[in-house]
Amino acid sequence: MPKTISVRVTTMDAELEFAIQPNTTGKQLFDQVVKTIGLREVWFFGLQYQDTKAFSTWLKLNKKVTAQDVRKESPLLFKFRAKFYPEDVSEELIQDITQRLFFLQVKEGILNDDIYCPPETAVLLASYAVQSKYGDFNKEVHKSGYLAGDKLLPQRVLEQHKLNKDQWEERIQVWHEEHRGMLREDAVLEYLKIAQDLEMYGVNYFSIKNKKGSELWLGVDALGLNIYEQNDRLTPKIGFPWSEIRNISFNDKKFVIKPIDKKAPDFVFYAPRLRINKRILALCMGNHELYMRRRKPDTIEVQQMKAQAREEKHQKQMERALLENEKKKRELAEKEKEKIEREKEELMEKLKQIEEQTKKAQQELEEQTRRALELEQERKRAQSEAEKLAKERQEAEEAKEALLQASRDQKKTQEQLASEMAELTARISQLEMARKKKESEAVEWQQKAQMVQEDLEKTRAELKTAMSTPHVAEPAENEHDEQDENGAEASAELRADAMAKDRSEEERTTEAEKNERVQKHLKALTSELANARDESKKTANDMIHAENMRLGRDKYKTLRQIRQGNTKQRIDEFESM
């Protein structure tokens, strides 16, 4: 039995190990990979490897793996990557896994600056990436620094703004919070809908020369071929939709494109190496085939996939709605519980206050009772003294009378009687004054006792009211394959039919233009970042983008502009560049 060969395939989010036979073809390995990851939209993808000359190459599906220019190492290393891009992600990408693989690959391209992305769009895209990873923002879970381990912005953007990590996190967090209620899968799709409007999205660039020898860029994408000046890969100058091309071929470094318009000359350019022309041919064939397929009714398989995807999405939405409903119920229950706890605490506090007031009133009552007793004792003492003085006065009166009688009876001498009379009169006067003073004091004490008695009655009434307040009970708790071409030339007929006249892509608008929410977010971010921007660190692409914005250009307006005029006019324009 022949010895097996170890193979390692790296997808955007996983690493797969396989053992293949020496006679295993590229298609057999590819089929094994897509089956393992559960991918059905296989037409976008391919297996990439570094050949013996360190060039990045796509594995040919119709040849044995071992017969290709793969480095002889163990295990053999391949990357599973998107080779072709859709025109419109929301219309064409059906499965969640397809959307996720595109999302991860596009995000990597943006973060590595392979796809130019302006700062404000980069921050908005970062917030969707965060929503797809973490779900809804939760301040209890997503504490300060929760994005510290994530690479979310291109290094260029970080260097162009005077903001530290915390300040960047704050800005991304604000937009993360804006996406509350959005499913992770929907966040992925929203990311791609904005990213596909970036000028460099989905474009394969090749360095070419025209007949004059001018160095230019050829851009191959889902919509056709575009020509760029050497110093500007954002703004194509001439465009040829796939519907205008009937044949593509190369002979060594010369590449020839024959237009459908028989009156138009051939579109000829030169690549620096034969292998580049082979790759251009393969990409043209694959993109053209997908372009034509999109303009025909969906196959039964695609219809079934779309129906299944709709059903799965509906199921997820139902589950999400159920979860949201349960979450709301739980939150309401928590709030009700908190409210009851709060009311309970308030009532307990009130009860405590009443108890303290009652205790204080009791103490005051006791104090007033004590004072009342003291005043009563004082009153009795004053009364007793007044009675004693009255008695003494009476006795003095009696003595006086007796003396008077004795003077009459005994005829004492006038001087003696006068002296005794004077003494007694003085004594009576003193006793009378003392009596009046004591009576005055008794009246004063009587008034004080009366006031204390009134305070006592009032306190008793307050205590009675406090004690009669009902006891508060504690509330109860609620709860294509690259054509295998060994030779230096190859040709491919690009079939066309009535559907080829469908150039609906020229009517498209950007997500920002048709989505008011995205437009508002981008304007707010542009304004917010302007104050922190270091103008001295602007790149050439930044300046080109700014100029395009000033002139009101976007990807689709430029597309319409560069396709104006007939094919001959555009080929002549290419030759004169």
Swiss-Prot record:
Modification(s) after translation: Phosphorylation on Thr-558 by STK10 negatively regulates lymphocyte migration and polarization. Phosphorylation on Thr-558 is crucial for the formation of microvilli-like structures. Phosphorylation by ROCK2 suppresses the head-to-tail association of the N-terminal and C-terminal halves resulting in an opened conformation which is capable of actin and membrane-binding.
Segments of skewed composition (Basic and acidic residues):
358-401, 492-518
Chief subcellular location: membrane
Q: Does Cell membrane count among this protein's keywords?
A: yes
Provide an example Pfam family for this protein.
Answer: FERM_M
Q: Any idea which GO molecular function terms this record carries? A: actin binding; cell adhesion molecule binding; double-stranded RNA binding; protein kinase binding; signaling receptor binding
Phosphothreonine (modified residue): where?
A: T558
Task: Please give, as recorded in its UniProt entry, the membrane topology of this protein.
Answer: Peripheral membrane protein
Report the record's disulfide bonds.
none
Outcome after substituting T558D = No effect on microvilli-like structures
| Cellular component, GO, one term | microvillus
Q: Phenotype when inactivated?
A: Moesin-deficient mice exhibit no obvious abnormalities in appearance or fertility, but display altered humoral immune responses.
Which parts of the sequence are annotated with region: Disordered?
Answer: 322-342, 358-419, 468-518
Which positions does the motif [IL]-x-C-x-x-[DE] motif occupy? Answer: 115-120
Entry annotated with the keyword Iron-sulfur: no
Record-given protein name = Moesin
Q: Which organism is it from?
A: Mus musculus (Mouse)
